[in-house]
Amino acid sequence: MKNFIYVTALAIAAIGASDSIAQRVELQSGDVSVLSGQKTVNIEYDYSEFGVGKFATEKEYLDKKSSEYNEKEAGKGDTWKKSWVDDRVNKYEPKFEELFNKGMEEKGIMAVHGKGAMYTLIVRTKYVEPGFKVGVMRKNAAVDFEIDLVESANKSKKVAQIDMKKVPGGQFGGFDYDSGIRIAESYAKAGKSLASFINKKL
């Protein structure tokens, strides 16, 4: 029993250490201090170009997986493919914004969808590892992000670029059999980490 508790504690510590390293936020260029005094920042998401797992593009991944599911059961792959895309609006983005806005409460800044904000955050997904959960075997999700802070009136004018690599996603307790749940946790952690980073710069 003592050995089990010890091993479990080590595992939790290792996960925590891994998450801490993986969530490092790197400012590639520019300065986010322009957000000081702002009440809102517009937010947009870009999924136009990213790899998934061992696949170079999302299209390759979706075509392969949906074909495999359809072979097992007619229509299952099409349903799965739609769910994969719908998870962006239904799961990923709400999680990102919830944790980002919670982290920015002290500074009085809120991410919004609209045209009123002076600056816009463009959250670009660059790579997704969906992970898996099969019985007692599991692999957490991980997502790479490139986040541009631009002027809303002229989005070609980049104010800052922030990168986050291998942001982990998974639920403690192992109830994340759905890849969408695991990936959503990566977005939640990314939103929280971004808010923490910006807070320190304002």
Outline where the language-model segments fall.
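Structured segments of extracytoplasmic/periplasmic soluble domains
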Residues: 95-106, 193-201
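Generic short beta-strand segments
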Residues: 46-49, 124-130, 164-165
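Glycine-rich, phosphate-binding/catalytic loops in enzymes
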Residues: 5, 60-61, 139-142
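A structural "domain/chain start" motif
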Residues: 21-90, 94, 196-202
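Short secondary-structure boundary motifs at beta->alpha junctions and helix caps
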Residues: 73-86, 153-200
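Bacterial Sec-dependent N-terminal signal peptides
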Residues: 1-27
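Surface-exposed short loop/turn segments
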Residues: 25-26, 108-157, 169-177
